[in-house]
Amino acid sequence: MKMIVRRTALAVCTLVLAVILPTAASAACTGFDDLPETADCYESVMYLAEHEITQGTGNGYFSPDAPVTVRQWAMLLCRAYDVKVEGSSWSDLSQSAVEQAYRKGWLNETALSAPNIQLCRGALLKSAFAAAKIPVYDSVLYAGGVSLPDHENCIRIGKELQLCGEANTANEIVTCRDAAMLLHAILTRAFTVTAPEAPVTLVNAAGVNINDYLLALRQVPEPMLAAFKVAGWTYRIDFDYISDLSKQLNMSCIGATSYGQKTIYISEASATLHEFGHFLDYALGFPAEHERLYLAESQNSSLRDYAKTNSREFFADCFVYWITYSADKKRMDDFRDAAPQTYAYMKKLATNNWGA
């Protein structure tokens, strides 16, 4: 699966604190005194300037080596993607930009409390990718890959797309030069990112980045994934279906399993294990033992209240608990002490490859 992303520049904000929302078109830019034509960022900066994106730091200077703050970058993104900001001063306008960028998912919560901090390259790339809808997948999802932090995955993708150099690191502070070159690239170039192969039939009806969903599927035991695929089941990311179901049931749902349609419907990746617990219940033929265990031990278990409503929810949550905490001795001891028969039953299932 490949995703191609392309953006065309319409309007982009200033890179520097000194430039504040010009209300009238400026004269054609003739260059900056501190930016020779031989500079590697010259083309990018001139593109931004000619499109009235930046006027530099004043007095004919661009200051390419000046660090870029979260506040400045937020303004940049809001102008780039025509997001309205409000205020009568730079402080108000840029704070509005930070808040808007956060709402759009372009910046994280830290940006709200610390808008004046300087951006590192990993954060800059993550934000740019989010704004441009360029998907980032964890390296562990590819053959031979290992799990990496978000910023490291962004650096990896940045290098693959030639948006940063091989020597660049996630934690290094970025400058106006870096921001200008990155912005110019994501607004004017097309990018192709190959998605990792899903272990089951996956339908992305919501059209979202499937990274978190693929990571959630990695938690499901391989024998179950194989059985799911062989049985002709589908894992479907479908916000509309879940929303309609929530309204019908008058409750908040994030996942559902349809035995008739052989489909797991998901809106949040965190529901994946629970819904696969329902699939396992189905694959085992809804054993009477599950009802017996529910009646005998559910109320004394340490599981959430929802797990105590019926045998199917109890079994699904037992599966989630087992997969999530199987390496945590204390958690497993607590489970065994509270529900010894259920513990023994789940242990036997796990030992026997979950009935595969």
State the predicted function of each range.
Residues 4-26:
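Sec-dependent N-terminal signal peptides of Gram-positive bacterial secreted proteins and lipoproteins
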Residues 13, 52, 60, 260-262:
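Beta-strand-connecting loop/turn residues
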Residues 18-197:
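N-terminal propeptides
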Residues 31-32, 53, 212-220:
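Export/targeting segments at the very N-terminus of extracytoplasmic proteins
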Residues 92, 149, 208-211, 215, ...:
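Alpha-helix boundary/N-cap detector
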Residues 198-210:
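Fold-level signature of zinc-dependent metallopeptidase catalytic domains
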Residues 203, 216-356:
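Active-site-flanking segments in enzyme catalytic domains
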